[in-house]
A protein has these predicted regions:
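Glycine-rich phosphate/adenosyl-contacting loop at the front of the ribokinase-like
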Residues: 1-48, 53-67, 226
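Beta-strand->loop->alpha-helix junctions that form or flank phosphate-binding loops
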Residues: 20-22, 46-51, 69-80, 151-153, ...
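Anion (oxyanion) recognition and catalysis
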Residues: 37, 63, 142-143, 198
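Conserved phosphate-binding/catalytic loop of the ribokinase/pfkB sugar-kinase fold
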Residues: 48, 70-75, 85-122, 127
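Short beta-strand scaffold segments in enzyme catalytic cores
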Residues: 82-86, 94, 213-217
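Conserved beta-alpha-beta core of the PfkB/ribokinase-like small-molecule kinase fold
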Residues: 122-192, 212-214
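Conserved phosphate-binding/catalytic region of the ribokinase-like
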Residues: 157-160, 187-228
Length: 228
């Protein structure tokens, strides 16, 4: 991830002077893997990286968190996935992703799951990898009764027959609008959108709303957590 912080995000055609510039180990999948490892989880990370400094350095970094990297493939003649991120003073962001090696992940790379997945495992995935791989993951997790958490970003269309098998979904307000056709302008709209996703069969809905915090809904619970 390459991040520039500024007072506001520029409009199309506008150039502004930004603030601090940062580079981080990132990617939604990598962030999820590291967070789970920090919380004490036994984590296996499956992805593809490029045959470059960023990819090799990333693998070394994951291993410092005791993440199992045996299923990380190195893709020849491809760059490691990169995200360019602009963040304003409220924490709102604008992101463009160049998938690189991430786009080369194949269903065959996940064939080990047929034997390795256990009932008490949890699978986290997002949409920075090919959509057919995501559909395979959802299907195999449902078949083996394994909970799957989906971060539906960057948005790609998933048919309801796949969404109904998702245990937990974590869209932001933009992705929620794509999924439900409801524009999230307040908590009441968040409730309507979350209910629509629950009606599709998803068990838990967590809508991230930037500076407005996080909204959670399940069949029998609901909460709004303010941003700090």
């Amino acid at each position: 991830d390459m991040v520039i912080k500024s007072d506001y995000i520029p409009k199309p055609g506008e150039t502004i002077i930004g603030g601090n510039f940062y580079t981080f180990q990132g990617g939604k999948g990598a962030n999820q893997a590291v967070a789970a490892a920090k919380l004490g989880g036994k984590v296996t990370f499956v992805c593809r990286v490029g045959d470059d400094y960023l990819g090799k350095n990333s693998i070394k970094k994951y291993e410092t968190y005791d993440i199992n990297t045996e299923y990380i493939g190195i893709e020849q003649n491809e760059h490691t996935g990169v995200a360019l991120i602009m963040v304003d003073q409220r924490g709102e962001n604008l992101i463009s992703v160049s998938s690189g090696a991430n786009s080369k992940l194949k269903i065959e790379d996940l064939s080990f799951l047929e034997k390795k997945l256990l009932n008490d495992d949890i699978v986290l995935t997002q949409l920075e990898i090919p959509i057919d791989v995501v559909k395979y993951l959802i299907t195999i997790c449902s078949k083996k009764n394994v909970k799957l958490i989906l971060n539906p970003a960057p948005y790609q269309k998933l048919e309801d027959k796949y969404l109904e098998k998702v245990h937990t979904i974590t869209p932001n307000i933009t992705e929620t609008k794509y999924l439900t056709e409801i524009d999230i302008t307040d908590i009441d709209k968040s409730k309507l959108a979350a209910k629509k996703l629950l009606d599709k069969g998803i068990k838990n809905v967590i809508i991230t709303m930037g500076s407005k915090g996080v909204f959670f809904m399940s069949e029998d619970e609901m909460a709004h957590i303010e941003a700090e």
